[in-house]
């Protein structure tokens, strides 16, 4: 007996959320949940509007942005932590989804913080 498509889609999302930092493929998820790759991708996209692996990549990029803004962890280590196959792949995907390479993203964020703090200190002096 096949479960309702929306129930399956939510099971897939829970699985992806729990394993998004690991190397993961659509085939692995489909085998784990005992459905075809095509059906899994179809019901997931129908429910959430994006293909499952794009969902995973967006989760990873969101977490990477957090690491880049809030830590000084090297980019290669962030890529590894988030399950990227290589630093080159991570850089390419980060740029694809944000429009900026990770190093430049971090640098721009730090400059905006410095500029913001400088502006606040100038306001206090007035």
Predicted segments, located by residue:
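Terminal helix-turn-helix DNA-binding modules in bacterial transcription factors
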Residues: 10-14, 18, 23-27, 46-91, ...
């Amino acid at each position: 007996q096949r479960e309702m498509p929306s129930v399956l889609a939510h099971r897939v999302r829970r699985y992806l959320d729990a394993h998004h930092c690991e190397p993961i493929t659509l085939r692995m998820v489909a085998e784990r949940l005992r459905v075809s790759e095509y059906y899994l991708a179809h019901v997931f996209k129908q429910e959430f509007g994006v293909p499952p692996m794009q969902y995973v990549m967006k989760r990873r990029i969101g977490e990477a942005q957090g690491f880049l803004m809030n830590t000084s962890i090297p980019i290669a280590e962030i890529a590894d932590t988030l399950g990227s196959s290589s630093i080159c792949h991570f850089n390419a995907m980060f740029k694809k989804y944000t429009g900026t390479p990770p190093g430049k993203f971090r640098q721009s964020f730090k400059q905006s913080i410095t500029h913001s703090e400088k502006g606040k200190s100038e306001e206090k002096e007035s």
